[in-house]
From Swiss-Prot:
Binding, substrate: 88, 141-144, 178-179
Annotated positions binding NADP(+): 12-14, 39, 82-86, 177-180
Gene source species: Rhizobium meliloti (strain 1021)
Cellular component, GO annotation: cytoplasm
Keyword NAD: no
Pathway membership: Biopolymer metabolism; poly-(R)-3-hydroxybutanoate biosynthesis
Major location category of this protein: cytoplasm
The encoding gene: phaB
Name the record gives this protein: Acetoacetyl-CoA reductase
Active site per database record: 147
Top-level taxonomy: Bacteria, Pseudomonadati, Pseudomonadota, Alphaproteobacteria, Hyphomicrobiales
Enzyme Commission identifier(s): 1.1.1.36
GO biological process: lipid metabolic process; monocarboxylic acid metabolic process; poly-hydroxybutyrate biosynthetic process
Reaction catalysed by this enzyme: a (3R)-3-hydroxyacyl-CoA + NADP(+) = a 3-oxoacyl-CoA + NADPH + H(+)
UniProtKB keywords: Cytoplasm, NADP, Oxidoreductase, PHB biosynthesis
Family: Belongs to the short-chain dehydrogenases/reductases (SDR) family.
Length: 241
């Protein structure tokens, strides 16, 4: 029986690429999403990957959503915590709501998804957790104090949880993408991309979602069983941590 992978924020962008790559690698894949129903259903039809809607900032919604996935596909062996939002503002203008929403999805959401799955992974003696953090969680970013704090928190969670899971056959790793050519990034004016963003990237281009996805496929595999508590920086040389 093939292993089951669950990807949060899996119906678009980097998450969609991760889902497609995991399916191509032979996994049974489920994609969580929270927003656009039409977009999610289109992804489901195009990819053949089932989609499930819930908000990862709610612990009970995660418990219920995971139960639906496991009833359909079987126990989840691989969890990719990819869901993330931004509520950018300079700190002196940031509201408690902007802070709380980003922390709730980008950091607490990782706990909410991982915690209900942890006991089952321990009992089965196998698990793969891959947390999609960000270059801005490594270096910080002006105007993104909330996002940078949440993504840095994901890295601390990764390192601590890796120590707890290692003896039970569970690995916990993180990937920190830089500028990736998602729909959101490519919507930035071409002048800004070419004059301000790409010159910061030593390889001279944006990354592709599929490049991040290939990192996930490796970390999910048996070949990566000796790698845990690690961070892969997929940023084209923009930042070395």
């Amino acid at each position: 029986m093939s292993r089951v992978a669950l990807v949060t924020g899996g119906s678009r962008g980097i998450g969609a690429a991760i889902c497609v790559a995991l399916k191509a690698a032979g996994y049974k894949v489920a994609a969580n999403y929270a927003g656009n129903d039409e977009r999610a259903k289109a992804f489901e039809q195009e990819s053949g990957i089932p989609v499930y809607k819930w908000d990862v900032s709610s612990y009970q919604a995660c418990v219920d959503g995971i139960a639906r996935v496991e009833a359909d596909l079987g126990p989840v062996d691989i969890l990719v915590n990819n869901a993330g939002i931004t509520r950018d503002a300079m700190f002196h203008k940031m509201t408690p709501e902007q802070w709380g929403e980003v922390i709730g999805t980008n950091l607490t959401g990782v706990f909410n998804m991982t915690h209900p799955l942890w006991s089952g992974m321990r009992d089965r003696g196998f698990g793969r957790i891959v947390n999609i953090s960000s270059i801005n969680g490594q270096k910080g970013q002006m105007g993104q104090v909330n996002y940078s704090a949440a993504k840095a928190g994901d890295l601390g969670l990764t390192k601590a949880l890796a120590q707890e899971g290692a003896a039970k056959g569970i690995t916990v790793n993180a990937i920190c993408p830089g500028y990736i050519g998602t729909e959101m990034v490519r919507a930035v004016p071409e002048k800004v991309l070419n004059e301000r963003i790409i010159p910061q990237i030593p390889v001279g281009r944006l990354g592709e979602p599929e490049e991040v996805a290939r990192c996930v496929v490796f970390l999910a595999s048996d070949d990566a069983g000796f790698i845990t508590g690690s961070t892969i920086s997929a940023n084209g040389g923009q930042y070395f941590a």
